[in-house]
Amino acid sequence: MAVSEANAAPMLVLSDFKGQGALYDGLIRTLNDGTFVHAYLISSPAGMGKRTLARLMAQHLLCTGDGKPCGTCPACIQVRENNHPDVITVTPGKPLSPEVKSGMAGIPVDEIRYVNGLVGQHTFVGGRRVVIIERAEKMNQPAQNALLKTLEEPMAGTVFLLLTESPELLLPTIVSRCRALKLHPWPDEVIMAALRAHSVESTMAKKALSVCGGSIGQALSVAADEAYWQRRRDVMQDFFGISARVDILKVSTAWKDRKDEADGLLSDVEDMLRTLMLVRFGKQDASLLEDYPEPWQRLGREGELPSFMKLMDAVTEARRMRMNQVTWQAVVEQLLLSLMEEKSKWSM
């Protein structure tokens, strides 16, 4: 991995994708021997590195240095800085076509027609051109049909990289004309190696691993995000540390004005409960229990699956209440009651 400057976000390099196993081996082989295809479909849940892999593939295809991608030649730098003239990036809400309004949630047909027109022109530098379509599932059906025509008659030297979290929303005929690159959650050991490579101390690395959902980028991001951990400390203190019903009103009142953090709070509670469950069943390091008050530590050591499922259901119910326009303070109070009920069983 590399960091371009002090305090900059860490950047993955192509070799970091060795953690994806056979996907990496096959991709490197085709890139190195020139047998790459004209279209790839890169799919994964959010945060697994689709955009990063697309950038690295573009660097490899356009690199003018040795050891592709070298990362230091003008082409590699331009790709990294998103200003290479032969890399076309389609992003929902940020149209290239003057006929498309900015801020649109989807990718309309006029945007794809505009891209098709660009693809038909000579490259600026000479050689290859790369077209990256982010959130490809956001193309409406006319847009997908317009892209399909181009994929059926590919221009020599042009490589399409379609990025999506929902490949099932793409036309089967588009999917069939792309080589699938399906990214999976990164193995724990790969994420820990990445954190160590960036000098993240051991305790923080374990915490970042427990909340990153298999995403290297997310792990590196939260490890350096003090505001994130401050909110989690607040959640731990207020939601897991509360010991008496008389404190519920006090806590709910304190969180009433933090409604903009509601999604994050519920995710934090869910993550903390999941960590307890994973520790209990040997899937996470037991040292993670040290952050929890003693009754919750006991749950993490001795709890049974029904207890964890009941707590997870309480978070699901809180989300349902929010969707039904229940006041945020009432949602917080109901969640606190559910947590206190379970905590009381482990306070003996």
Q: Which functions belong to the PLM regions below?
A:
Residues 95-99, 108, 155, 171, ...:
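Generic structural signal for alpha-helix starts
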Residues 42, 133, 147-148, 164:
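Hydrophobic residues in beta-strands of the RecA-like P-loop NTPase core, especially within AAA+ ATPase
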Residues 117, 149, 172, 176:
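Conserved adenine-binding aromatic site and its adjacent loop/helix in ATP-hydrolyzing domains
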Residues 2-142, 296:
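Clamp-loader machinery-focused feature within the broader ASCE/P-loop NTPase space
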Residues 141-145, 263:
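Conserved strand-to-helix beginnings and helix N-cap segments that scaffold or border functional pockets
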